[in-house]
Amino acid sequence: MDLSYTVGMSRYILMSIQTRYAEKIFRGEKRWEFRKSLPRHSKDDELTVVVYSSGGDRAVIGEFRVGRVMRCPLDELMRLTGYDTDEQAVQWFSRYYAGRKQCGALEILASVRYDQPISLSQLRQVLPAFRPPQNFRYIWPDSDLAAQLSEMSAICPDILSKLSKPRH
């Protein structure tokens, strides 16, 4: 597995997201995905999140393109994401990020729900050791996961070529 990191690449990550939040992403109701830890990301990278819905459906259901990646103190994150005037949100995020100096969020720019979700059982038929990530995992171009997602996905059949080519 190639773990090298080249700036300016198209990057894909598989991220577990609770079903209720994943649904909001694909309905266009959620603009930010808040995380305690974020993937390595350069401003020159094009980052796409492949969504594993971790609820009852337990399936890869779509993807979204990432805009800004925020790593900053909570008060700044609340201001930048527009939640600073919502007292309930500030309280919730204060508990969620308790004890952290830096908080993270991914801006959701464009989302696409797959016509055919890829179930956990389908993935395990071809990748028996597959375990959904607790948070996220990189989808490396030469990985079995990339090959299977490419083969199974109607939306992104050329994921392997996208993963391995620098953007211009």
Language-model features: locations:
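Contiguous surface segments at macromolecular interaction interfaces
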Residues: 2-13, 17-43, 56-61, 69-168
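Short conserved beta-strand and strand-loop elements enriched in small hydrophobics
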Residues: 47-54
